[in-house]
Amino acid sequence: MDNVLARPADICCLKGSFHSGDATGSTIQIDGIDTYVAKPHPDKSNGNVLLFFPDAFGLHINSFLMMDAFAECGYLTLGVDYFLGDPVTKHSLTPLSDPNFDFESWKNKHLKASEDAAARWVKAVKAQYGSSEDVRFACVGYCWGARFVCQQLSADAPIFFSVPSTDKLFEPEQRSRTIEILTENNKQFNMQVFANVGHGFASRARLTDPYEKWAKEATFKSFVDWFDFWMEKK
């Protein structure tokens, strides 16, 4: 039986670039967990809530800018600090080349702890923001955060994957098996695969590379289109 098809976080989760820009959201606490809140303009709000599960760098500028962009598309976007103040960026801004950063130790500390924090946070978010019958929830996860989408998403809800063609954490055989399982169980899904980009491209692409920048932006647009379509259908 296939319990988990994607492999645990590895050194590839530390690759990529930091982006620049001005974050427009704010940070609050939900059940004692730091949460970045990006609010849509009232004229653009669709009344839906998007839960954002960040990569190993946690609540950092790349995540802030993406959450702000989702808010621009109408979604009240909430990002969780499931590392509880201890993301990779607390230890190093250059973790791949920093001899003082022990990734394996950091990973082992947070694999289970981040799951517990995420589950607690999601429960609190639903209690705080889901009191109205009109509120609908969607979720998006990058790198470290992708598994939380699978854990928190309803078994019957549509799911969208955007992945690189070469990824040691989600190899072609695993992608194919994922498609087989979803198809066998008559689940609604879509998967887009990008060549010549690395793990984490959707959140940490090199924006100086036109193709990587396009792949990142195409992924964002696909996510928004997917949310808009399925949230409208409910």
Curated annotation (Swiss-Prot):
**Family that this chain belongs to:** Belongs to the dienelactone hydrolase family.
Q: Look up keyword Hydrolase and say if it applies.
A: yes
Please name the catalytic residues of this protein: 143, 167, 199
Keyword tags: Hydrolase
Q: What is this protein called?
A: Dienlactone hydrolase 2
Task: Give the E.C. number(s).
Answer: 3.1.1.-
Question: Other remarks on record?
Answer: Fusarium verticillioides possesses 2 unlinked loci, FDB1 and FDB2, necessary for detoxification of antimicrobial compounds produced by maize, including 2-benzoxazolinone (BOA). The FDB2 cluster arose as a duplication of the FDB1 cluster with rearrangement and expansion by incorporating additional genes.
Question: What does this protein's UniProt record list under function?
Answer: Dienlactone hydrolase; part of the Fusarium detoxification of benzoxazolinone cluster 2 (FDB2) involved in the degradation of benzoxazolinones produced by the host plant. Maize, wheat, and rye produce the 2 benzoxazinone phytoanticipins 2,4-dihy-droxy-7-methoxy-1,4-benzoxazin-3-one (DIMBOA) and 2,4-dihydroxy-1,4-benzoxazin-3-one (DIBOA) that, due to their inherent instability once released, spontaneously degrade to the more stable corresponding benzoxazolinones, 6-methoxy-2-benzoxazolinone (MBOA) and 2-benzoxazolinone (BOA), respectively.
Q: Which InterPro entries match?
A: AB_hydrolase_fold (IPR029058), Dienelactn_hydro (IPR002925)
Part of which pathway?
A: Xenobiotic degradation
The highest taxon in the source lineage is: Eukaryota
Q: Which Gene Ontology MF annotations are present?
A: hydrolase activity
Stimuli inducing this protein: Expression is induced in response to 2-benzoxasolinone (BOA) exposure.
Q: Which SUPFAM superfamilies match?
A: alpha/beta-Hydrolases
Q: Which Pfam families does the record associate with it?
A: DLH
